[in-house]
Amino acid sequence: MNLKKLLALGLSLTMAATLVAGCGSNTNAGDTSGDQTADKTSSDKSAQQVIIYSNADDEAITAMTHALDSNGYQGQYVFQTFGTSELGGKLAAEGKNIEADVVTLSTYYLDSFQKKEKLFADLQNKAKTIQPSPSYWTPILGNTGALFVNTEVLKQSKLEAPKSIADLAKPEYAGHISVPDIMGSSTSWLMTQAVMSAQGEEAGAKTVAAIEKNAGAHLEKSGSGPLKKLRAGEAAVGFGLRHQAVADKARGLPIDYIDPTEGNFQLQEAAAVVDKGAKTNPNAQKVVEIIVKYGRPELLKFYPVALYEGETVSAENKPARPSFYKEPLTVELLQKHQKTVKDAGK
């Protein structure tokens, strides 16, 4: 996830309104490097070509492209990338009539659509995931939350490093922290899930609201914003994606990461096949299988969260307290948490 901006919008019965505002769309065609006229007529090839709609970052698209090109699908697919809300909106508006054969999207979106409209087919030859997952999606990448500090600014500010996310609500951290806004970033939802799991929804919402108040001008719409503020020396403490802070520390920056006592919560993005009945692309299932089987090693380099049995990551990329929210993650639950936090801050 290059952290795409999120906006809280109402989710109607048709789910036409979605909430994560992302970047604009572009097209990345997997068939541009291959021979367009190899063995089939263009019309026949087009009929079998797999259209993939994705909200993934450039690194993830590149990894999936490498996997497909190296395993017999060069020239047999087209990627089209969208912001999360844009892709969610297309799925809501078009349903099974959408052009895409395969979608990759945040799992809470996929689950919400499946619950409402049964948009996705059960996957064949699905690899075994570490955490239980439904039959209609398979994860492609995961992101885990953590606290991080600029060690130099922390010392200059004469602050103790926090042990918990809740510590950031203390008066001494006011003006010294940067966190993502629950209304603007899915990364903030990781922070909110952690605090609500530890304190309950009502008390947790008050804590998150107090943290946002302490952040002041450093309350960021982008999930990557807090770490950027720490790199620039504009804040001492922040919350964001753990692997990004690990990478900064490895590069020699004065950044360190802290696994909060509330836990390291996780969000996943996954691939699913659009169920179009008899019109379902016969190659779609194989494309998803190849992305997972051959794309995961490269994806792990950019998103070092083990998702499948047998996968391993380096010691520094293993969170001390891996955690998952007690309820299934859905768009509706995110909206509920957004409202609860903002109401608590009034």
Language-model features: locations:
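A ligand-binding cleft/hinge motif common to bilobed small-molecule-binding domains
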Residues: 108-114, 231-254
